[in-house]
UniProtKB/Swiss-Prot annotation:
Top-level taxon: Bacteria
PANTHER family with a match to the protein in the record: LARGE RIBOSOMAL SUBUNIT PROTEIN BL17M, RIBOSOMAL PROTEIN L17
Protein name as it appears in the record: Large ribosomal subunit protein bL17
Species assigned in the record: Campylobacter jejuni subsp. doylei (strain ATCC BAA-1458 / RM4099 / 269.97)
InterPro entries on file: Ribosomal_bL17, Ribosomal_bL17_CS, Ribosomal_bL17_sf
One Pfam entry name: Ribosomal_L17
Subunit structure: Part of the 50S ribosomal subunit. Contacts protein L32.
Gene3D superfamilies the record matches: Ribosomal protein L17 (3.90.1030.10)
GO molecular-function terms, A-Z: structural constituent of ribosome
GO CC annotations, alphabetized: cytosolic large ribosomal subunit
Keyword entries, A-Z: Ribonucleoprotein, Ribosomal protein
Length: 117
């Protein structure tokens, strides 16, 4: 039973899941919009929104906290200096998920995840 289980395992070990979320976040920050499976998009939404909330402060400690999660200088700088300031007056809901199609090979539900304009 999965009573009160707080996250999706996505069929991966914890380290693989952490690496997956980190890589998806870097891709989302760099391109602004990515297509992935719906469960991955839903997990990514929570991960990214926590990072943006932290990055909104824009100070040195925010840079360090975001870099600790992403380990990528370019994505960290873009998130803290370009993306997060756009959401200065918004309390959460920085991303949106749009269901797109059913993938032909395995019938997985696909979705776009992007930043709210």
């Amino acid at each position: 039973m999965r009573h009160k289980h707080g996250y999706r395992k996505l069929g991966r070990t914890s380290s693989h899941r952490a690496a997956l979320l980190k890589n998806l976040t870097i891709a989302l920050v760099n391109s602004g919009k990515i297509e992935t499976t719906l469960p991955k998009a839903k997990e990514l939404r929570a991960y990214v929104e926590r990072l943006i909330t932290r990055a909104r402060l824009g100070d040195f400690n925010a840079h360090r906290a975001v870099f600790a999660s992403l380990q990528n200088k370019n994505a960290t700088n873009k998130l803290v200096t370009e993306i997060a300031p756009k959401f200065k007056d918004r309390n959460g809901g920085y991303t949106k998920i749009i269901k797109t199609r059913i993938r032909r090979g395995d019938a997985a539900e696909m979705a776009f995840i992007e930043f709210v304009a």
